[in-house]
């Protein structure tokens, strides 16, 4: 929810994220794992069931997890895996790929094709790049240049584009939450029953009340009952990752590959921890971004649908 700026000054009116510019604004100003920490708090508040392999869900019926396998534990897990994912992706950025930001590539296109004050410079860019729909759309703006329009006033970050920090953290945190909670649990009933923690008034998230100032219409899709914990966590991860592209600072593959890098970081972290719990048996499962069932148990990772990925985790 953001202030609605009028004349550069914030006003009391607030609104939900509603378009690509709003989403780009969020991923420019957020704390990196903010969306998933908030999601964890909501899942805990809504009483989302734990994964069936959590001992406190299936075995210890008269106890609840706390410091281990409980609420405080998952909150620290989300924070810890975010840090680990960042370290992994920063190595890829600086020591492996060093990929140009889209903004910088637009600058190369400008200097090769149009130049500056009549002076051009050859960078070896192929002719077809200038004939793409995207290049023509950018050139067709009033400025008439190939400089990329940016949603971020500060422009692109000065570190390389591939992989994407936001996407790696998104993949890691979403995977941690999908493994921790029952990811195929339907969400509609829990969302409809949600109340504000202070006022206890209904939040009306799924079917907001129609008011003159409400810019979010009621959801009319027939698939409302099919929304699940895992599906909504995937949606958050995708929105945050792609929101950086909407800001103009990433290529699509920066995000799609880094989501999977984060997924692997989280899975390896769970694998290493799974041998240390006193509570037995311990097993966590989730659906990967590719729709594969992944199970972590006793220091091993099983991926029946992808033997190569299972072999990777066995290293």
Indicate residue ranges for each PLM-predicted region:
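Hydrophobic alpha-helical bundle signature of multipass membrane enzymes
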Residues: 1-315
